[in-house]
């Protein structure tokens, strides 16, 4: 399995990757993207099984990325890892096709609970 982690903060990408490993997903290949536009290109070139995206990023936000993927007919598994945790934002994310929203600060247990139904 391959997971694409999209966040404009390199440090946050590393924290997400470390937390994935702590949650038991250390055998998955990880690909990084520095913003939504980079993630959109890497979905095509890397064919990940899951995208974990921040909400607020330059060039293309996480929700714009998700809408672009769905608009192109791409049903890739998609979830947000973000500090934007309002009920309205979560509703927008789910209506656009996100499977889950993990709110920062997060724990390995939060990742495991969100990812287990998606990755098995």
Where do the language-model regions lie?
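A Lys-centered signature of the CheY-like receiver
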Residues: 8, 104
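Alpha4 helix (beta4-alpha4-beta5 surface) of REC/receiver domains from two-component response regulators
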Residues: 64, 85-100
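Active-site residues of response regulator receiver
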Residues: 54, 82
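C-terminal output helix
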Residues: 88, 106-115
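Acidic, metal-coordinating helix/loop segments flanking the phosphotransfer/catalytic sites
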Residues: 32-50, 71
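Acidic catalytic/metal-coordinating carboxylates
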Residues: 35, 61-67
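Two-component/phosphorelay signaling modules centered on CheY-like receiver
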Residues: 10-31
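Receiver (REC) domain active-site loop signature in two-component systems and cognate sites
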Residues: 57
């Amino acid at each position: 399995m391959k997971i694409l982690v999209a966040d404009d903060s390199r440090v946050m990408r590393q924290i997400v990757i470390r937390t994935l490993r702590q949650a038991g997903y250390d055998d998955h290949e990880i690909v990084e993207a520095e913003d939504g536009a980079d993630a959109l290109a890497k979905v095509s070139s890397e064919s990940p099984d899951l995208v974990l995206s921040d909400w607020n990023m330059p060039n293309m936000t996480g929700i714009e990325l998700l809408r672009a993927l769905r608009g192109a007919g791409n049903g890739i598994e998609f979830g947000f890892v973000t500090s934007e945790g309002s009920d309205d934002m979560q509703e927008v994310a789910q209506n656009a096709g996100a499977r889950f929203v993990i709110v920062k600060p997060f724990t390995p247990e939060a990742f495991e609970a969100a990812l287990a139904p998606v990755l098995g």
